[in-house]
């Protein structure tokens, strides 16, 4: 009698373990999404750092940065700052035509981040006391993507 319960328990445990284990395709997909996010952030950074575009007004806007950025769930903090980022870029766009595709980039970043972090929005960002410029903001998220990608490649 106990053997049957033990076998059923083991079978259910195996099913749970199998269904919750990440597959190589989901890992590969996550890797591709991280690389796409990194590419989009670098493109935005390149546009902002353009020598012709050093608009002092754009650099005065401050962005909130989380104290710790180490896991995919921290991408929620990036999502929360995308609208202010888009507003600053739209302001600069009126003066510089190089920024005409910033809406597409922000949209791509938003979609990619939502796919990476999932639909859970209960994570609360713990922001740093000191705000960052647009350049610092983009650089921090670029470094985050690079570190996550390198960790995944090491595993």
Swiss-Prot record:
SS bond partners: 77-125
One function term, GO molecular function aspect: growth factor activity
Signal peptide: 1-20
InterPro entries assigned to the protein according to its UniProt record, in alphabetical order: 4_helix_cytokine-like_core, IL-2, IL-2_CS
First-listed, main subcellular location of the protein, grouped into a coarse class: secreted
Compartments it resides in: Secreted
Glycosylation: residue positions: 23
GO biological process: adaptive immune response
A GO CC annotation given for this chain: extracellular space
Keywords: Adaptive immunity, Cytokine, Disulfide bond, Glycoprotein, Growth factor, Immunity, Secreted, Signal
Similarity section: Belongs to the IL-2 family.
Function of the protein: Cytokine produced by activated CD4-positive helper T-cells and to a lesser extend activated CD8-positive T-cells and natural killer (NK) cells that plays pivotal roles in the immune response and tolerance. Binds to a receptor complex composed of either the high-affinity trimeric IL-2R (IL2RA/CD25, IL2RB/CD122 and IL2RG/CD132) or the low-affinity dimeric IL-2R (IL2RB and IL2RG). Interaction with the receptor leads to oligomerization and conformation changes in the IL-2R subunits resulting in downstream signaling starting with phosphorylation of JAK1 and JAK3.
Protein name from the UniProt record: Interleukin-2
Protein source organism: Dasypus novemcinctus (Nine-banded armadillo)
Encoding gene (name): IL2
């Amino acid at each position: 009698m106990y053997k049957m319960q033990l076998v059923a328990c083991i079978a259910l445990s195996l099913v749970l373990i199998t269904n919750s284990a990440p597959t190589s395709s989901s890992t590969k997909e996550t890797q591709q999404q991280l690389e796409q996010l990194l590419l989009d952030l670098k493109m935005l950074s390149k546009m902002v750092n353009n020598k012709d575009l050093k608009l002092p007004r754009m650099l005065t806007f401050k962005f909130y940065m989380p104290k710790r950025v180490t896991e995919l769930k921290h991408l929620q903090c990036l999502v929360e700052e995308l609208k202010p980022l888009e507003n600053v870029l739209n302001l600069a766009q009126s003066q510089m035509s190089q920024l005409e595709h910033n809406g597409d980039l922000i949209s791509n970043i938003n979609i990619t981040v939502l796919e990476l972090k999932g639909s859970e929005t209960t994570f609360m960002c713990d922001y740093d006391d000191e705000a960052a410029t647009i350049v610092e903001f983009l650089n921090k998220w670029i470094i985050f993507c690079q570190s996550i990608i390198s960790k995944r490649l090491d595993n």
